[in-house]
């Protein structure tokens, strides 16, 4: 008997289904099921994944949706044709617009308005009067397309329930059909389905009750089993295939039409594009197009005409032109940088006359895939561009792609642990010990946490968390992938409001969009562009020099000298530990060297064993041999090593006779070979083609192995060149305008590898004067202040560094002092009108010290004395009261000031950095007693020396290409030290590695040229040494007891000494205890 399961819920139902479409389709295929109807609740988010699973297995997909209505009625709907599908997507869009984010609010009247051409299956619970009313509605609306589900609930009198539903269906002339309401693909997933129910309902397995499924039967069953379960309803079983035959619609019928663009009057899109290209040529080539570039441009325009992509290029051109008109810094990157047309239009910045790029990497007639242009904008101004796109194309025709937020290790352990009722401290201990998103927790890790690995709930938590990893949690919004259409976008896919105001997203992510060959425009945010724009503004204001990315001096020798020394903290792309370690070895001297530098520190070249051969050849330690002149022409610039994706494509084209389209298919197959195994068909073609062209079989095999090794991670040369431009520009500004770079970098946070504390420390090491936050000098952003009469400038820290201070309050402070500086706390409070809480935050940040000379405690004491502003009605009384105050002035109080160590703690706690001594400096005497040397001494030691050093943990990195090796950067008062932690030590000392704020390391120095690492052999957590750092000062030899609140800095509590009763009751302002025992250093961890 043929049978189709028409009620299947995938895990794209978000915490309802417990299996993926791939698992469901593969299992259904093995069981002999003819087709699957995917009906996720009020959503089509997973339907493209279901289509791909259907293609992979050859099993028929029936597209559907379960509509759970506001009145409790549930109907499964299946569009029979393209028009009905569009009505379904509009219906879901309507419900999402009403319900808001993660909700869908639909009524029966909505179903009536939109379900023409759909098959409907009522999902009843009990055969009662309500069921009869619903069946009558179904019959009236759907007619011969109305069905009712017969599904076992495994309750008492289940067969009687089915019999009565069947009788009601006959009475209202609605046909019955068997469904199994599948939630998981095989019985073993029942426990996970219970857990996701607990997560969704925010309860525990002990309390979930009847919210969970009452039976374990919600898995796929073979047709024979379904026939055994429903022996009296053979016709209802057969109707499953009847519905499959009636539903002829497939997602492959969706035809995407790009929106019409504003074009030159009297010209079509292609002619308009060519008009703009030739119009923009003088901007890029004032002396005319070089002949070779002219040839490339004509080739590209011909291909664009053939592929009908002109509207897409016009769209991106319009967006970039708008951004530039608003002074928003932007630059295209990715494969689009291979295009001469994109360069001439100003979309990208890679000149094809100086860079040998490959257009087929971007657009290929054989590939028949839409182009993909990524444009980066300043991250603080990108929203202006996004809203312009919405205004220009309308919200009916424009929306962002979704991103699928999936469970990773920590999130899975947290949610599963809560669902199973584990104590919060156990959950925290387990999740905090995880590093990578796919990492498993072994028994030894559990024992290290002093937990019992045999505890049943703990074991079940780890097992189910592993099953949950990778499952969708919810939909988010793509950073900037826009889908634009000619007709209504909600005819193609449901649209829902995003969490962020004035944005909307489709239910599909970028992979879904690419699978259906929709075009998208990526409007991305890049923090370094924001930094560069702010740096240019500061330079223009204070240095009287008008700079932008195109006006920066190229090939500046001083800048490259700085780069070769790895003095690149804060710059773009070349600031990471791995990049800094590579710079002294690669020694970039030209822009192309920088392109190689950006690309070589990637998993691809490392896995393809290309880094060391390239470096040896560059240093002259290994000869470069090319079997043929053709190969030398392709790989000459990279010394015979195929470092880029374009290199792999050119080798295939020149040496093996591939066409441009075939070469790009080779690249794509390598990128997915781990998952699809599709690379083997190209291996034979590549090897045989190279042998046929005179290359030795061994050389051909070696070439393919290299390409295969880096294919999945290889970097496009065009992408590397785009990034190298910004890397060079940021390095140039850091080199020649370090104060502007420092201020701009802090003003653009959060971004990059390093926190403001390290940025400021690096700037000071380069001779930049950094001044503290000041109520009379600071603005919201960091600014530059002239040093005396010189042409040098200092960086003044801005109010943005004050934790807890609102932008609006900072703006009120700045506005109030425009004419006159503040002379006291009271003066500032009354003129600015900021709430007292803002004053407290400023006092904690020591912002009253630079101009008012008020230490933290003095400022907080003054804030405590502030009185409420009197109302006009009581002005006379207020005057009398003030006179009384004047007559009975409270005597001045001499507060005991904080120690230097205590001030450092407060600096870190309230501004994230300190301009005083480094915290480790206060511990140096004790560390020296333990034979712990400084980081500088360790990094200057000879190769092979054993050293013992310590510092604050700044950055932890564990790249996927490093085979489990972790790289850590620590810092003391003398500078940073770079650590290497092998996997065995990491597993032994996991808690110390992941949980330390301060760490001691015993290890051996590894020196290769100017690159120095400390290879750790032992690790110790010294975070406890930071406790009570306030006491580490000569002035604090005999610290007062904790009971002496005055000495310990607790202005929020009362003074127990006798005080005269004040004339006017002071206004109580809550001020937390200033004595923070532990310095908390927030490190940055990168995966």
UniProtKB/Swiss-Prot annotation:
Q: Where in the cell is it found?
A: Cytoplasm
What keywords would UniProt list here? Answer: Cytoplasm, DNA damage, DNA repair, DNA replication, DNA-directed DNA polymerase, Nucleotidyltransferase, Plasmid, Transferase
An MF annotation (GO) of this entry: DNA-directed DNA polymerase activity
Indicate where this protein is primarily found: cytoplasm
Any Pfam family: tRNA_anti-codon
**GO aspect biological process, one term:** DNA repair
Tell me which SUPFAM superfamilies the record gives: PHP domain-like
Question: By its UniProt entry, which SMART domains does this protein fall under?
Answer: POLIIIAc
**GO cellular component terms listed in the entry, alphabetical order:** cytoplasm
In residue numbers, the region (Disordered) covers 1040-1064
**E.C. number(s) listed in UniProt:** 2.7.7.7
DNA repair among the record's keywords? yes
The reaction(s) annotated as catalysed by this protein in its Swiss-Prot or TrEMBL entry are:
DNA(n) + a 2'-deoxyribonucleoside 5'-triphosphate = DNA(n+1) + diphosphate
Q: Which domain of life is it from?
A: Bacteria
Function of the molecule:
DNA polymerase involved in damage-induced mutagenesis and translesion synthesis (TLS). It is not the major replicative DNA polymerase.
Concerning PANTHER family, the annotation shows: DNA POLYMERASE III SUBUNIT ALPHA (PTHR32294), ERROR-PRONE DNA POLYMERASE (PTHR32294:SF4)
Family, similarity comment? Belongs to the DNA polymerase type-C family. DnaE2 subfamily.
| Protein name per UniProt | Error-prone DNA polymerase 3
